[in-house]
Amino acid sequence: MSGLIEKVSILRNDSIHVGYNMSSHIVDEILTKKASSTYVLITDSNIVKMGHLQTFVDEFNRLIPSKRPGSRILTYVVPPGEANKNRATKAAIEDYLLEKGCTRDTFILAIGGGVIGDMIGYVAATFMRGVRFVQIPTSLLAMVDSSIGGKTAIDTPLGKNFIGAFWQPDYVFVDVAFLETLPEREFINGMAEVVKTAAIWNEQEFSRLETYSKRFLKVIRDRRVDDSVDLTSLKEHIIKLVLESIKVKAEVVTLDEREGGLRNLLNFGHSIGHAIEAILTPQALHGECVSIGAVLEAELSRYLGILSPVAVSRLYKCFAAYGLPVSIADKLVQKRTNGKKCPVDVLLQKMAIDKKNDGSKKKVVLLSKIGKCYEPKASYVNDEDLRFVLTDEVLVKDFNSAPSTAVVVPPGSKSISNRALILAALGKGECKIKNLLHSDDTEHMLNAVAALKGADISFDDNGETVVVTGNGGNFTATDAEIYLGNAGTASRFLTSVASIVKPDSNTTHVILTGNARMQERPIGPLVDALRTNGSDIEYLNREGSLPLKIKSGNGLKGGRIELAATISSQYVSSVLMCAPYASEPVTLSLVGGKPISLLYVDMTIAMMKSFGIEVTKSTTEPYTYHVPQGHYVNPAEYVIESDASSATYPLAFAAMNGTQVTIPNIGSSSLQGDARFAVDVLKPMGCKVEQTATSTTVQGPTKGTLKPLPLVDMEPMTDAFLTASVVAAIANDTNQSTSIVGISNQRVKECNRIEAMITQLAKFGVRAKELEDGIEVFGIDYHHLKTPSDGVYTYDDHRVAMSLSLLAGLAESPVLIQERHCTGKTWPGWWDILHTTFNVELDGHEAVVETTTAKANEDKSIIVIGMRAAGKSTLSHVIAQTLKGFKVVDLDDVFVEKYGDIREFIKENSWELFREKEAMIAKEAFKNYSKNTVISTGGGIVETEASRKLLKQQMKDGHIVLHLHRDIEETVVFLSQDKTRPAYVDEINQVWERRKNLYKECSNYFFFSPHCQTEREFFTLKKTFSKFINRITGGAVPSIPNGRSAFVCLTYEDLAPVSSKLTRVTNGCDAVELRVDLLKQHDSHFISNQIGILRNQTSVPILFTIRTKSQGGRFPDDSYEDIERLLNLAIKLGVEYVDLELSLPESLLDSVASKRQFTKIIGSHHDFSGTVKWNNVEWENKYLLALKLNVDIIKFVGTATSLNDNWELEHFRSLHTDKPFIGINMGPLGKVSRVFNTILTPVTHKDLPSSAAPGQLTLKEINEYFGQFGGSSRKKFYIVGKPISHSKSPELHKTFYDEFGLSHTFDKFETDDAAKVFNDLVKGNDELGGCAVTIPLKIDMLKYVNELTDSAKSIGALNTIIPIGDGRFIGDNTDWIGIRDSLHQAGCEIAPESSVGLVVGGGGTSRAAVYALHQMGCSKIYMLNRTPSKLSEIKNHFPSNYNIHIVDSLDAIDEDDKLDAAVSTVPGDKPLDDQLISLLKKLLEKKRGHAVLLEAAYKPRETPIMALAFSRGWKVVPGSKMLVNQGIEQFYKWTGYQFSSHIDL
């Protein structure tokens, strides 16, 4: 068929050509019939990669010499994607055409998908006031939609396709061969337009599409190695579906070229679909959104009484059959869009700017049936009806407008429908089933029968009739799980069917599964009965419930089968229907008490007779049935009567509102027990009931006069008890209630319906109580019904929803009913009946939608999970210290309090019982400690489904569930030495392998904690972890530097061997870039370990970068899944920055960006070629994309081939100021750009093995160059005080300057006169960078500064003066930082509320020591001085909560106190007072654990107090440490550089 060209006429020209492998035809046709001096081929880079452009170029080059000598061809390639369909790209194309001298005879070929077709068509429409062009669509969507009809456009930031023109192409060449290289998802995406077009215009083609869906998906999913597909077996179908779709659009366009009305019909599904797309783009594709929109617009048609429920069901199933989503809630849509919400108000706003609208009036294309629209144009619709269709909650308003009479035909009986499908599939021959219920339940049954190859299924009468051609009971196993949702009937019937399934060559079993509720519902008695009769059935999860694994080939032995049927009659019907296919006749005996719902068993027996098998009841044994062997013979036609359970709702409506309702096709001859509802329930309550053999009419009494029923046994119609309950709720008699019995089976339906009804009636102010096998309802006057404040919860149960909707319209104000879509199980159109037949006003409602913007954690509790020995207990306390006011609750400790020692409990009981109790404790703790608590859990909490559900619910409720982990080998070593905890049953590595994915799914943050070998490493880790906690809780969101800053680019393949270098390498940088692509491994564990090593060594913010090959890195360009996995891991690890390459697919970019939480996103783009100059449109397009993604920082890197490239970059920078911008050029000529870049310049370091990019400089080099260029001024710094001759400060700060290439100076200014310092050094000195203040001026200088930091105010002394401009100065105190960091680095542990500190001395530094110890968490501080009176002044200076105790005698020391930290601030070179030594010795003897003493004096190297402390087991820290640490803080305050390297003075 490759040589056959089909031509379609549009606007009276045969200009649409459809065929296969048409390149030669296309070029020959153009050259023969369209003369031009210049043929311009325009496409995108994706089409170039596939070789399509070159094919056309070669063909032109072959034919031009003979066909058009003297003509030329030009090619232009644009970047792919919707982001490039804009004014800038259009202008660049036009500039190119002008530069090449193109004139009005230019002929353009637009080769590509919809983006290319739309944009290049618009170029053709406007270039030289319009030139000729052809559309050569390469995607299915473009072939059947955008290429046809002459619509051309570009996008703007305010919306898609807002600027464009109608400009008809000379040709549209549709070469179906292009589809061989179309990715699967794009193929399926295009099918949305195909199905939509058939739905509005061509029912015959729609029916054909329905039959081809399975073949279609099978072929397009069978991919070659290069991801292409062989369409040979499907070629005719593909060409036909393309042709038929094109013919419809061509006909419509011919009749209405400029969209006067008829052409609106092509927008079926687009009014709502475009609104959804505007929110979910780019993760959701156009066709996917149109599919969802079409289903919703069809539901709108049904809601308005225009379209039949069967037609909606067909449309729904057809879209779904082609792999398209049919709901925003679709799991794949949710996954792809990261759960992005589509708020109804936003959708309506988006719909308000639809081009079809008339001003503010919205218009939607409505269907009247498959293949025909309601009007020859879009129809007006109101927001109320749209709001209803778009939401899953409904506000039911009053019933005051109810008609006096109504006729309602409920959908087919669910019970009969499911039985008829099973019997027809078991039978032989064709059976036309009419009035089948089209619902979720029957859909699951149809799918299951088809999956097991039990029958061929087709549709007649526009889908109203289901044609089942049974295979005589020959079912075949399938390797795919059969998912049954919450369809209890289907699950029970199919369990017996699965027992008679035959194996195929690949599969020897059938797996039946369902949703979470289905996996709780009972099926045990049926399984027991089948097992005893030879079936091999295995429970895969919970004993007694789905999922089941049923071995094929065993069949049923037959003979006597005993079955307990007190819970469900469906067990009985299931066995009965399959019994004829047993190896011998079956005698089925029901045991264990009176069976439930025997009328349904009678129904089954009657239906079996209709299909040729007669069951006889035993005359000697009760509840026993004899089933002969045989085969069902299908009747030619079987009509399903309407569902009697569903009929109870409109009949009850009449009863409760005093109106008349007739059900025309259910009467006394019905097979269904619920048909007796009107006679047995409503009539005794005061209704007039007329029932014939085939119809039922109810006339309700005057509203409010219903009578209660003292006792009614509803065992024959248990499902109808909910309807009876709501009628009883307004049967008002203070002396009488209504008791309904015989309904105990309703406790194990979709929910516990008895409990549900009691709970929900209470919301209306109606009291009800539970009976042993029923419910008692105490009715009230309907005028006194309350409006449920939080609405009616339906438990996802169709019968709860429909029954309570009857009560809702009688309440005093509108009632909210949640999860209204659950009625789709049996009556999808129930709300339509309320609205159109009963004239009830309904309004859609939506709960407040949480935004995706990251929210601060505030007081929400944090749950910590992870393996044993991961550091949960230790780090939980760090969390509590970080988040002031939080406490720690360890669930292992709670367990011990309740049940005793864990090891003993497991030994005496079992691991299973331990896990059960653990889950109960967790549930209780999550409820009782929901605020201000860190909840540390046991390592195995993720082992059980119950606990996992709890953890996932915590995440849904906005809590942080933090997974802590450390290197597993270190864990093995630690646990092998720990004898206090129960031994693992399995090896630790095996436990980790089993749990690691469970931890992943149950946590929203992850922290990897490598082994700390030194106290400094542990200090750094705790500091970093504290910052991590502050960040993920929103307490300290990383701020983007607003001045000169840099990040160092690591180029190691593994950080472990070089970890000791990391502190030095990151010195002075504002961030450190982990180049993930350069690492030797890319698994999550290795990457997490690398992050952990970084956090062990430095607290510098981390930039996580995956640089792909095309962007100058090593990561494979097309490994999108791995890229997304690792980027998501980075966000879960809470890194400060993530680099997102703007060349990645837009859907991936948007997905990652939407999950950012508190991580900052850097949108980057690199050009290594040097050919993309700074005036190239590519930079502009990438910048617009970055803005659209709302990245936090934009990073563009070009390549300089001349110095002028740097000045072009600066010009680009000056014009693009919307976001912080990193802009540099690579290469030797681009070095100057690195000097002039301000924010986060990438730098290298001399200790790195290589630089990350050509021309990269060190931080020192950049500062030196910047200073030489005059970019920074030289500042003068001083230390002031007396004596300072031996001060180490000048040496310290000069070390800093040298490290960072700064030209500043640091000198001594010795004086004890504060006024002299101010007048001679500070006042009017523009060169002053700052002053370090030492004794005796720390207090005296306070009056010479304009402001004080909080610490300086609290301490009452300063040691740092910082100029802030305009002759103003801030006073700060960094001594306390020096003290705090020195103690921390030495491993000093301070436990809030229990730690005790000591300060020796009474000078200015002692104040800083008091402040430091208090900030660290000391609850009591002792002070000791040779002159105790001086200490009173200090004590009085600080607030009382500092809890300062002056030690002037031994009596002042509490015997119970243990000291954790001490600071000596007395001069180190002066003798100590005997009294002081005596008291100090006593205090030093009262140490706790690893107590640390810091000596503030750094001369001499070892002071007497250090010696005293050391001799008593204290760890002592020399004063030089404090000097360095406070100096580092001073240097940071003055220059903005954080010095992190080790310094010895």
Curated annotation (Swiss-Prot):
- Gene Ontology CC annotations of this record: cytoplasm
User: Which keywords belong to this entry?
Assistant: Amino-acid biosynthesis, Aromatic amino acid biosynthesis, ATP-binding, Cytoplasm, Kinase, Lyase, Metal-binding, Multifunctional enzyme, NADP, Nucleotide-binding, Oxidoreductase, Transferase, Zinc
Q: Name one Pfam family in it.
A: DHQS_C
Task: Write the Enzyme Commission number(s) for this entry.
Answer: 4.2.3.4, 2.5.1.19, 2.7.1.71, 4.2.1.10
Task: Extract the ranges annotated as region (3-dehydroquinase).
Answer: 1050-1261
Q: Which reaction does it catalyse?
A: 7-phospho-2-dehydro-3-deoxy-D-arabino-heptonate = 3-dehydroquinate + phosphate; 3-dehydroquinate = 3-dehydroshikimate + H2O; shikimate + NADP(+) = 3-dehydroshikimate + NADPH + H(+); shikimate + ATP = 3-phosphoshikimate + ADP + H(+)
Any Gene Ontology biological process: chorismate biosynthetic process
Q: Which Gene3D superfamilies match?
A: 3.40.50.1970, Aldolase class I, Dehydroquinate synthase-like - alpha domain, Enolpyruvate transferase domain, Leucine Dehydrogenase, chain A, domain 1, NAD(P)-binding Rossmann-like Domain, P-loop containing nucleotide triphosphate hydrolases
Q: How is the cofactor bound?
A: Binds 2 Zn(2+) ions per subunit.
Instruction: Give the principal location in a single coarse category.
Output: cytoplasm
Task: List the residue ranges of the region (3-dehydroquinate synthase).
Answer: 1-383
- The positions flagged as active site in the entry are E259 (proton acceptor), H274 (proton acceptor), C822 (for epsp synthase activity), H1166 (proton acceptor), K1195 (schiff-base intermediate with substrate)
| Chain segments carrying region Shikimate kinase | 859-1049
Q: Where does Zn(2+) bind?
A: E193, H270, H286
Query: Which residues are listed for ATP binding in this entry?
Result: G866, M867, R868, A869, A870, G871, K872, S873
Q: Which residues bind 7-phospho-2-dehydro-3-deoxy-D-arabino-heptonate?
A: 129, 145, 151, 161, 193-196, 249, 263-267, 270, 286, 355
Which residues does the annotated region (EPSP synthase) include? 396-840
Q: Which cofactor does it need?
A: Zn(2+)
Where it sits in the cell: the answer is:
Cytoplasm
Under Gene Ontology molecular function, one entry of this record is: shikimate kinase activity
Which biological pathway? Metabolic intermediate biosynthesis; chorismate biosynthesis; chorismate from D-erythrose 4-phosphate and phosphoenolpyruvate: step 2/7; Metabolic intermediate biosynthesis; chorismate biosynthesis; chorismate from D-erythrose 4-phosphate and phosphoenolpyruvate: step 3/7; Metabolic intermediate biosynthesis; chorismate biosynthesis; chorismate from D-erythrose 4-phosphate and phosphoenolpyruvate: step 4/7; Metabolic intermediate biosynthesis; chorismate biosynthesis; chorismate from D-erythrose 4-phosphate and phosphoenolpyruvate: step 5/7
The entry sums up its family as follows:
In the N-terminal section; belongs to the sugar phosphate cyclases superfamily. Dehydroquinate synthase family. In the 2nd section; belongs to the EPSP synthase family.
HAMAP family recorded for this chain?
EPSP_synth, Pentafunct_AroM
> What is the role of the protein in this entry?
The AROM polypeptide catalyzes 5 consecutive enzymatic reactions in prechorismate polyaromatic amino acid biosynthesis.
Q: What is the name listed in the Swiss-Prot or TrEMBL entry for this protein?
A: Pentafunctional AROM polypeptide
Source organism per entry reads Komagataella phaffii (strain GS115 / ATCC 20864) (Yeast)
